[in-house]
């Protein structure tokens, strides 16, 4: 057995043991740990930023691009936000132990579902060290143990944050092994983590498409994931023109890099001649490059031609594919073929069209008269989220605390027997 395998197995064994204690942990103890972590982060800001400086120095030497350097940096503001996030999660209701509706059977037996932790969650992520705190806090609050494997470029930052998390757990008399940070940058550690079915119950990958595609191929442990966010907005013939303009503009320009950003705009042919030029003008003035079908190009002179590849691309930048469609059916066919199952929206005042779209578009989130950038756990009232899932099994859409739990059936009787 290699040293990496031994390291990972030890982490797994410790996490499994800690998960049993976390399953029993009270909401009060979990909240005490979270609040202790918040204080420790503020008090330890100088040490955190010193560790972060080591990562930044190495990243600059390796030519890391400015946008990624920004994500890696633990500024005063980001440290404050991590502490605030911990306090917010402490204030959320604890899902563990909650009971669903109770059904009383004809023999008087009472049947219900109880929320319980998943067990041990492996989380694999890139660049942003704040994910260490977000992920640890959500797993802790939902009664799970977790093994965190961050990007190699953030190793010093992640280890420093992991030490704070473990100190917070200890302060609340919870097992420090409930949150462990992988201390090696060897990629073999990831390969081992996603195959440890005896110790890990689920993997949550947060990163680029390449990372998630690789894990989907290699993993033997179930994944909660989304591969990409190729999101669509369809402007129906019955759309309010001003509302359509505002929604399309916000869906693309709110933040290019979020996974809910609109990547393809579909416009009904009946309103395309009047609506598309208005939307195109606003987006072009904002610096967005448009790539359209032949009908779109005829309506907006100078628009670049879209290739077939554009329809399936998550740009995460100031580029938008545009297509004029014959009707609602063609719009939904386009989404079914090219969409990623993440988030898709219709703009319409036609109730029947809205209901059909929500019923028939098979995405984890389907909107009516809203921009796709609302794809976020806070916006859904879930509080913090661990990520967004396009899976059909278990969690789907933004995954908050409840998504990090499962259920068991609990039955109560008075001595009934089965005849």
From Swiss-Prot:
Q: Which GO terms describe its biological process?
A: L-proline biosynthetic process
Q: Which domain of life is it from?
A: Bacteria
**Keyword annotations:** Amino-acid biosynthesis, Cytoplasm, NADP, Oxidoreductase, Proline biosynthesis
Q: Name one GO molecular function term.
A: glutamate-5-semialdehyde dehydrogenase activity
Q: Which reaction does it catalyse?
A: L-glutamate 5-semialdehyde + phosphate + NADP(+) = L-glutamyl 5-phosphate + NADPH + H(+)
Look up the EC number in the record and give it.
Answer: 1.2.1.41
As for subcellular location, the record says: Cytoplasm
User: What NCBIfam families does this protein's entry cite?
Assistant: PRK00197.1, proA
Q: What name appears for this protein in its UniProt entry?
A: Gamma-glutamyl phosphate reductase
Gene for this chain: proA
